[in-house]
Amino acid sequence: MLSKNSTIKKLDDDYYNIENKKATIPSLFYEVNEIIFKEGKPNSDLDKAISIALWLKKNIKGGKGLSLASEEALKAMINGNGGVCSDMSQIFNNFCVINDIKVREWGITMIPFDKKYGGHSTNEIFSKELNKWVLIDVSKSILFYYEKKREPLSLFEVYTSNFSHNYYTFLEKNIDDVQIQNYYYNKKASPFLISKYNNSIYDKYLKSLDTKFPVFVIHFFIYLSGKSYSYKFPLNDYKNMFR
């Protein structure tokens, strides 16, 4: 089963860097990282993460979804050949790894499922300075906070705040995006952690089989091999999705 119920506590030590070490990240990410931080790196984890997210937002116009190995996906996105929120989240993961930032990738769906919402991808990074996980939506360029406290919020804080949270952008001007309302201010919105995603394994299969099989077949091969990722739902019972 790809989907599993979990708890907030059980996910404390579940993050992308466990499966993906710096030495396994493709070389193009290191080359682009030099460009991102050509003026030097900020000191804090959150400021480094924001710098990465800002560069990606300013240099990737987005477009169609990509089903490519990570290095090919990054190349395509930089060249203006597509990229949706999940593509942005996935390449952000790799930049965080090479900058020694703990990172997680989350999907957001509706429970019960509602086909008018297409789903969304976002990230969390662990800030050593704040000693907490911080939700950062790379494709929307936003963080979240409580009205009277400017400390950025974790994903769990956002989804258990009873909509008392606000968001702010780290772009030049604030944005009003209907998807922000749909996925962060909606009682049906349910986050799930993408757990145990091994970038090297998916890169290997996608590179060797992408001209021979559809992407969903490649993912099924990986699932049969026992090396697939899973979706972990800490706040809602995923079994209610189609009831």
Question: PLM features: what roles do these ranges have?
Answer:
Residues L74-K75, G118, K239:
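Charge-rich, low-complexity amphipathic helices
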Residues L153-R243:
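Alpha-helical and coiled-coil interaction segments, frequently adjacent to or embedded
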Residues Q90-S164:
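Hydrophobic/aromatic-rich core segments of domains that either
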Residues N5, N17-N20, N33, N43, ...:
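Detector for Asparagine
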Residues A49, S89, E172-K173:
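A structural signal for well-ordered alpha-helical scaffolds and beta->alpha junctions
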Residues S3-G83:
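Secondary-structure boundary elements
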